[in-house]
């Protein structure tokens, strides 16, 4: 578990790959002004948290509370990234007294269905993992180029992020299992979420992982919810433009109403 910085506590939940290390630029940017508590998902070998396969998706919801308890935090802003958004929203619905704010970054919604390419990957994750990795740079190139237009800075980002990914490899089999766990889970009613909520997405043309319209579905379900587009980003804006992402969250935490 990572506990870094001082100020308003933010619990940052990683996406489907399950590794907090992939989010390090966002962790560092947020920790300049806030206290960031993050972790890898509990079914990762490096995780210090328990995982009972019989509990399936509920493991991750329990993990959020365990992390807060270990950090000595009674209440926090809970932020979920992509698949982590499902975890964050479920925790906010089931433990509303512990959530003072909810942030859903390029988040999956319970109604999400994988597209054809994603379904192929889920059927044979190990066999297709090399193809998935090999085609990742091409899928992300437009987004990274928009976020980091300077060639030198872009090359440095790709090298640094690639190093983080290689050092903290994701398990294709676990990723596929996480999707199945979510699809089988009985989610709490969204009206149980009482915390002010911020939806952060990239631009629709740049997110090739989770369509922006999927994340926006929360706007129809939550009473106190707003949407902000992080310009020149797609699905991974919190790492391509971490300071901008931290700025959006900071203004949300300060209670400033942002334009959707």
Language model: regions and residue ranges:
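Conserved loop-alpha-helix segment in the C-terminal half of the alpha/beta-hydrolase fold
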Residues: 197-233
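Active-site loop/oxyanion-hole signature of alpha/beta-hydrolase fold enzymes
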Residues: 37-79, 247
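Catalytic histidine-centered segment of alpha/beta-hydrolase-like enzymes
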Residues: 230-242, 246
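Gly/Ala-rich beta-loop-alpha elbow adjacent to hydrolase catalytic centers
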Residues: 80, 84, 88
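Short beta-to-alpha linker loops that shape the active-site pocket of alpha/beta-hydrolase fold enzymes
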Residues: 40-45, 108, 233-234
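Flexible "cap/lid" loop of the alpha/beta hydrolase fold
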Residues: 93, 100-131
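Conserved HGGG/HGGXW glycine-rich cap/lid loop of the alpha/beta-hydrolase fold
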Residues: 2-48
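Conserved alpha/beta-hydrolase catalytic His-Asp/Glu region
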Residues: 113, 134-191
């Amino acid at each position: 578990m990572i506990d870094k910085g001082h100020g308003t506590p933010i619990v940052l939940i990683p996406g489907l790959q399950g590794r907090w290390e992939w989010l390090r630029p966002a962790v560092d940017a947020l920790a300049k002004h806030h206290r960031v508590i993050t972790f890898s998902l509990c079914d990762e070998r490096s995780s210090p948290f328990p995982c009972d396969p019989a509990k399936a998706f509920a493991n991750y919801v329990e993990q959020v509370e365990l992390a807060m308890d270990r950090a000595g935090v009674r209440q926090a802003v809970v932020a979920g990234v992509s698949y982590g958004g499902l975890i964050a929203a479920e925790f906010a619905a089931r433990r509303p007294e512990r959530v003072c704010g909810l942030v859903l970054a390029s988040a999956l919604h319970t109604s999400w269905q994988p597209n054809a390419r994603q379904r192929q990957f889920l059927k044979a994750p190990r066999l297709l993992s090399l193809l998935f990795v090999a085609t990742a740079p091409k899928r992300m190139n437009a987004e990274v180029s928009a976020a980091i237009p300077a060639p030198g800075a872009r090359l440095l980002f790709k090298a640094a992020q690639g190093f983080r990914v290689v050092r903290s490899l994701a398990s294709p089999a676990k990723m596929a299992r996480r999707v199945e766990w979510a699809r089988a889970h009985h989610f709490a009613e969204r009206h149980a979420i009482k915390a002010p909520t911020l939806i952060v997405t990239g631009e629709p043309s740049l997110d090739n992982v989770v369509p922006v319209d999927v994340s926006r579905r929360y706007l129809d379900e939550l009473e106190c919810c707003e949407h902000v587009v992080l310009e020149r980003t797609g699905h991974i804006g919190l790492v391509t433009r971490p300071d901008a992402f931290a700025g959006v969250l900071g203004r949300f935490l300060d209670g400033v109403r942002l334009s959707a």
